[in-house]
Amino acid sequence: MKVVVAIDSFKGSLTSIEAGMAAKEGILKAHPDANVVVKPLADGGEGTTDALIAGLGGERIDLTVTGPLGTPVNAHYGYLAEKNTAILEMAAAAGIILVRESEKNPLTVTTYGVGEMIADAMERGIRNFIIGIGGSATNDGGIGMLKALGYQFSNENGQDVGEGGQALERVSSIIIEKANPILKECSFHIACDVTNPLCGKNGATYIYGPQKGVTPEIAEELDQAMNHYASVTSKFLHNDYASAEGAGAAGGLGFAFLSYLNATLTPGIDLILNAVELEKELEDTDITVTGEGRLDHQTAMGKAPVGVARLAKKYGSKVVAFAGSVTPEATACNAAGIDAFFPIVRGITTLAEAMDPKNAKSNMTTAVEQVFRLL
């Protein structure tokens, strides 16, 4: 019997690989001769870098970059030598987790550090990039990232436009020739789960700006500035991605990747499943095991476990999911490809006890073993 295990992290408790290995232990207790393959799982958001480093034997590269507030922050990215690929999370350099509530200012926060991470990887000879752009603190249209990669943005007096959302309305000319020439050798694959355009009522500023400090008083001004930036970009680069799906992601960072770096934007789970080559293992599997910390109605709407299930169903595999907790609405997961799901917690316990890594591993192993005794 072949079993493929791909479980998302139990945030604050188990990493993807830790959860997967605990499940593998349970399977082998029930079926010692089973062929169990454990794959890392993530959705392109928080934890993706670490999951792929651990699951694919990657290297962690630590560095100091410019944070969203313009001050140095410690960041890291992953390097997969066999694929000559870097795994980055923009939030490591420009994430909202790096900004206190009182410090949120869409006019000044910058994505410059994201560009520094990419530049560092290019200097090391890396040419392929998988980048998650969730959790941003920024609304600068990606202009900070692009400046770190060599692009020059000037105002009507030929001066640098500065940083943050306030820089967008000042853009008068773009010197494309100053961009790092190595960029032409690179491919960028962006994990993006939003479809918003760059501007307008459904764009970056109006939809995602409020959580980053955009007030009603400055929303219209910022949106107009973003539209101006898009127009100048179109003039100098001879393309137009302002209305493209995902252009409004991460405060317009999606637009920057599309317009300047010829990137592809792909739903996070699809991009990660391809990166870990999960489908190849599912072609001849008998049972697929997946899961996450909490199974609920959101899981059924396309989160990582359902992404695994849909892929497994292409090859007729049974799919079993395990979770720390399961809500009544999780029954929607059955129609989404998960044949059966089970909570791993045994008995009444506190949240802290349930999330303790030692307890979570033990609970996972026991729950999986008992289910697999029926299979």
Predicted regions and their residues:
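N-terminal loops that bind phosphate or other acidic moieties
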Residues: 2-133, 137-375
